[in-house]
Amino acid sequence: MSTPSLEKIRNIGITAHIDAGKTTTTERILYYTGVSHKIGEVHDGNTTTDYMEQERERGITITSAAVTCEWKDHRINIIDTPGHIDFNIEVNRSLRVLDGAVFIIEGVAGVQPQSETNWRLADRYNVPRVIFINKLDRTGADFYRAFDTLKEKLDIVALPLQLPIGAEDQFLGVVDLVEMKAIIWEGGELGAKFHDEPIPAELAEKAAEYRQNLLDTALAVDDAAMEEYFEKGDVDVATLKRAIKRGTIDGTFRPVLCGTAFKNKGVQPLLDSVIDYLPAPTDLPGIKVAAEEGEDEAADRRRIPAKTDAPFSGLAFKIINDKYGTLTFVRVYSGVLRSGDSVLNTTKGHKERIGRIFQMHADKRAEIKEVFAGDIAAFVGLKDTGTGDTLASQDDPVVLERMAFPVPVIDISVEPKTKEAVEKMTLGLQKLAGEDPSLRLRTDQETGQTILSGMGELHLDIIIDRLRREYNVDCNIGAPQVAYRETISKSHTEVYTHKKQSGGSGQFAEVKIIFEPLERNEGIVFENKVVGGSVPKEYIPAVDKGIRVQAETGVLAGFPTVDFKFSLIDGKYHDVDSSALAFEIAGKACFREGMKKAGPQILEPIMDVEVTTPQDHVGDVVGDLNRRRGMIQNQESSGSTVLVRAQVPLKEMFGYISHLRSMTKGRASFTMQFHHYDPVPRNVADEIMTKSA
């Protein structure tokens, strides 16, 4: 595959709620672009992008997969992402490095919870998007109702570029509002054959109405196009497409297309829209460099434009360990890099040498000798590069804008079934945690148990299954536990003196530290305010280390302590007896004493819960959620069903699905995702502390 110009590259993601048809759509794209010669199906377990054993067994996407295809002289790099909330890290890191996205919306249900979550992530990274309303062949599918949910739930200007012809099993094709024609798919040949014809008479009036809306909305972003429209009463197709592309990239509106990927209708025009409306790397202003410490994240900063004749820069966004070694997926933002070259990991401050470079096609790979700005490739040979690290030329050692990762909310204890497997289990878990930034691994300092923290029960179940399959380690697993955290609610200044004398050289260190609460998700922040050398510079990192190590075990119930700032403002040292170890010990002890006086609190994860229930069970569902300490947010009726939205502590949601099925005779369903951490009520805190004592 030859290297196209930057203007002819599209880096896109395909994302949606689980079961909306992401992988099915990707399979059709690969078939119509000639990459694959047969169409894989999720239910048959033979799709290209769902290549892990667990994905094929369960019929769900677990890890994002990168594939490359060509369409009309353009290269499209596609990442197919998971739809289940437990694997949201894959969507997060993919959207971070992509230039555009296709959001697939189910034609029956419309916008669903995970679509909303992914949409907010795309908003965070300013990713241009087109929307594909899928599954219009299904019983109950309604393009116009699904379209209304785009405006209601996503609060966007949704702009139809197509209208459906027929509905449910009579869905035949689409009205193309840009070129004002009908596109009809013929039977056979897996949807590869279709033809244009005049718009059906019964749709002519509606098509004219929607065409006028398209012109009014799209041309408003392009003064020259609007002027042409006023002069001639219409615009040519190229002018209209140019205006749609501009409005798509700047987010003024979101183009909407439709079809049914499973029945092979609508995918080729979707591919055309990727070429016509989603940006090439050169259409975007370039990625921002990271904010300096203390700098406002929203401030204007230098951007790295997509150019091949510039110093190399790239972002590592995914790590995979397989039988061949470690693969590091990198989005290249500028420059050229060849196998054998050396680059700087500017995040960590060390050199890396590039071994081999691969273009990935799901789990298959093709070796290439070099990568250019705009490419997505996998590197072999990197020793210490993790997700979110920047790789850059030594001529311009930039650090690119960092990635944000979700907070794990569920803990399990893990131990191997045999003592001989301890080392193998630890190595396996470390490698899996290196691949997945939403997975945390720690050792309980009191019990010595290995604690694994993840996004949900399915997430952790998959990790343990991978440990067994890939590392040949069977484990005993503790019952899932809520991943509580601790924090403080007020400022406090603590002085601690560590003094130990028992013959020979002793230990001495004194620290004076201010502990202050921070907002949620701000982590742990250290500031050195020592003046006059009361604590020598070489000992200050030891104080920082001591606090951070001790913060893993909070003062109330032993949970990790988060969201606080500690400032070293003074201290004392001894010329002979002071050492880094003495100051680390002093930092740990100062934390233990100071935190007790800073209003310590236990935090619990609060989940966004959505329950879809028949009308006659609403009272039971709402009453039950209230008993679970839930806060009802709102209720939406749709025909005979009601959607109940609530925020409920995760602690109260274990075993909920069985109870919900029993309460509604199996007719209700629910989804749940993490929203925020909140202090627990006093009675719950007492219960937690009693259990941990």
UniProtKB/Swiss-Prot annotation:
Q: Which SUPFAM superfamilies match?
A: EF-G C-terminal domain-like (SSF54980), P-loop containing nucleoside triphosphate hydrolases (SSF52540), Ribosomal protein S5 domain 2-like (SSF54211), Translation proteins (SSF50447)
The GO terms describing molecular function are: GTP binding; GTPase activity; guanosine tetraphosphate binding; translation elongation factor activity
Q: Which domain of life is it from?
A: Bacteria
The protein's UniProt keywords, in alphabetical order, are: Cytoplasm, Elongation factor, GTP-binding, Nucleotide-binding, Protein biosynthesis
Question: What name is this protein filed under?
Answer: Elongation factor G
Cellular component per GO? cytoplasm
Q: Which organism is it from?
A: Granulibacter bethesdensis (strain ATCC BAA-1260 / CGDNIH1)
Q: Which residues bind GTP?
A: 16-23, 80-84, 134-137
According to its UniProt record, where is this protein located?
Answer: Cytoplasm
Q: Which residues form the tr-type G domain?
A: 7-282
> What family is it from?
Belongs to the TRAFAC class translation factor GTPase superfamily. Classic translation factor GTPase family. EF-G/EF-2 subfamily.
Under the heading CDD domains, the entry gives: EF-G, EFG_III, EFG_mtEFG1_IV, EFG_mtEFG_C, EFG_mtEFG_II
Cytoplasm listed as a keyword: yes
The UniProt entry, under InterPro entries, shows: EFG_II, EFG_III, EFG_III/V, EFG_IV, EFG_V, EFG_V-like, EFTu-like_2, G_TR_CS
Stored NCBIfam families:
EF-G, PRK12740.1-5, small_GTP
Q: What does this protein do?
A: Catalyzes the GTP-dependent ribosomal translocation step during translation elongation. During this step, the ribosome changes from the pre-translocational (PRE) to the post-translocational (POST) state as the newly formed A-site-bound peptidyl-tRNA and P-site-bound deacylated tRNA move to the P and E sites, respectively. Catalyzes the coordinated movement of the two tRNA molecules, the mRNA and conformational changes in the ribosome.
Q: What processes does the entry annotate via GO biological process terms?
A: ribosome disassembly
